[in-house]
């Protein structure tokens, strides 16, 4: 039988209803930490919404917190049909907690359809034996089922049947920012880089603007997905948390995330602030400036962390020119590079109190985008044309072996399952 999730409960609104008890398996080299104990496998889920203490219907920056979830409940047979029985040639990618397949559904009813008929969707089939897989599935349904914004990926439906856990998303044909940014010998044009981070910033600003803020906790280039127009949408809410309540400054939680992006205060103490997301956003800004990955153990000692390595260079406008990606030379002005360095440096401030709010970041980036008037944009136009010819898969969310610096490599998560 398929399962329908109860988002609301009459129990105390101070609890989230998320309970996972697990031991920790530690892995090195930035791969995911997982657990194998204690997952609930009943065919129905009765749990309180994480949004039970947020005012419903809040509209902010063209987004809203929905009064009730609008998700289609699929049975397992539906999704077997939509993916040709999960055949290997339908698989888009895989990770530590499951695999993602290309599927087909009716564009109007979202009912499963024959391959090649209707619209393409992305179907994530999670590993039901993993407690973390179950926790992430539940978190995605809770958050993406209740949040609507043009810069958040749309969750269309879900399935929980026996031990099967699946999620159905809109398909993002242009892949992820990561899949474009770190391609070898094919630099991604500056105009698209700035457009994409502005869209991502708007999505993050929306999460932070809710009456009870949502902390995304896993902001990184591989989680910024792109539609056919290169409009950015945040994906993967498996680690998202509600922000602090009752005028507290932070929430305390087990340390989970991705090396190179996690804020220093969170790594040191487990204290998670709304502005911990701002730090991660600053890391992505540094990535689009340099074309280098946030964390790479193949780099020389002292350069593994992009932030630790290049933070000192950002305050010197002459050095900023030296760290900019050589592949996009001529596509931006000196003023643009200097202003980008300034907002990036502000975002990666060691003290979260000194970081800007994401709404301010959006305004600054929009201003910078308007500054970028270069004499000759022919190289940019050609680069955009080259990018448009390729649509790399973006669902390979497991860390792989790192090769050369510009070789595509998704950083893996660290951390243990949360209680």
Curated annotation (Swiss-Prot):
Domain of life: Eukaryota
Annotated phenotype, changing residue 4 to S: Partial redistribution from the plasma membrane to the cytoplasm
Binding site for ATP: 92-100, 124
Residues with PTM Phosphothreonine: 253, 258
Biased composition (Polar residues): 15-48, 378-390
Active site: 218 (proton acceptor)
Keyword field contains Kinase: yes
Positions where Phosphotyrosine occurs in the chain: 169, 266
Location in or out of the cell: Cell membrane; Nucleus
Lipidation (S-palmitoyl cysteine): 4
A Pfam family annotated for this UniProt entry: PK_Tyr_Ser-Thr
Annotated stretches, region: Disordered: 8-48, 378-419
Lipidated sites in chain (N-myristoyl glycine): 2
Membrane topology, record value: Lipid-anchor
Catalytic activity: L-seryl-[protein] + ATP = O-phospho-L-seryl-[protein] + ADP + H(+); L-threonyl-[protein] + ATP = O-phospho-L-threonyl-[protein] + ADP + H(+)
Annotated EC: 2.7.11.1
Subunit: Interacts with SOBIR1/EVR and RLK5/HAE.
Protein name as catalogued: Probable serine/threonine-protein kinase CST
The species this protein was found in: Arabidopsis thaliana (Mouse-ear cress)
Gene: CST
């Amino acid at each position: 039988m398929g399962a329908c999730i109860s988002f609301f409960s009459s129990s105390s609104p101070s609890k989230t209803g998320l309970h996972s008890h697990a031991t920790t398996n530690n892995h090195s080299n930035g791969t995911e930490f997982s657990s194998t104990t204690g997952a609930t496998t009943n065919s129905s889920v009765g749990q309180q919404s994480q949004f039970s203490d947020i005012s419903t219907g809040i509209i902010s920056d063209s987004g809203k917190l929905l009064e009730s979830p609008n998700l289609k409940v699929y049975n397992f047979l539906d999704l077997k049909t939509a993916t040709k029985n999960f055949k290997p040639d339908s698989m888009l990618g895989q990770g530590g907690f499951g695999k993602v397949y290309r599927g087909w559904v009716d564009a109007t009813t979202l009912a499963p359809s024959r391959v090649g008929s209707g619209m393409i969707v992305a179907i994530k089939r999670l590993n039901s034996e993993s407690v973390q897989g179950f926790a992430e599935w539940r978190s995605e349904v809770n958050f993406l089922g209740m949040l609507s914004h043009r810069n958040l990926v749309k969750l269309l439906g879900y399935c929980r049947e026996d031990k099967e856990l699946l999620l159905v998303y809109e398909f993002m044909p242009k892949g992820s920012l990561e899949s474009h940014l770190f391609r070898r010998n094919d630099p991604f044009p500056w105009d698209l880089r700035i457009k994409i981070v502005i869209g991502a910033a708007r999505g993050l600003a929306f999460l932070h603007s809710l009456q009870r803020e949502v902390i995304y906790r896993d902001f990184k280039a591989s989680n910024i997905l792109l539609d056919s127009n290169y409009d950015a949408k945040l994906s993967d809410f498996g680690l998202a948390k509600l922000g602090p309540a009752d005028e507290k400054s932070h929430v305390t939680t087990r340390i989970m995330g991705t090396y190179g992006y996690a804020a220093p205060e969170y790594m040191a103490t487990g204290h998670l602030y709304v502005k911990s997301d701002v730090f991660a956003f600053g890391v992505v800004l540094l990535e689009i400036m340099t074309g280098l990955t946030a964390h790479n153990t193949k780099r020389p000692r002292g350069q593994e962390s992009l932030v630790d390595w290049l933070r000192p260079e950002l305050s010197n406008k002459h050095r900023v020119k030296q760290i900019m990606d050589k592949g996009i030379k001529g596509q931006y002005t000196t003023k643009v590079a200097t202003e980008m360095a300034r907002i990036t440096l502000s975002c990666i401030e060691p003290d979260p109190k000194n970081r800007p709010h994401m709404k301010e970041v959006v305004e600054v980036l929009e201003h910078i985008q308007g500054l970028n008037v270069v004499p000759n944009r022919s190289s940019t136009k050609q680069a955009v044309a080259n990018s448009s010819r390729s649509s790399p898969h973006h669902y390979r969310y497991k860390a792989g072996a790192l090769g050369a610096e510009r070789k595509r490599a998704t950083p893996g998560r660290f951390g243990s399952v949360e209680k």
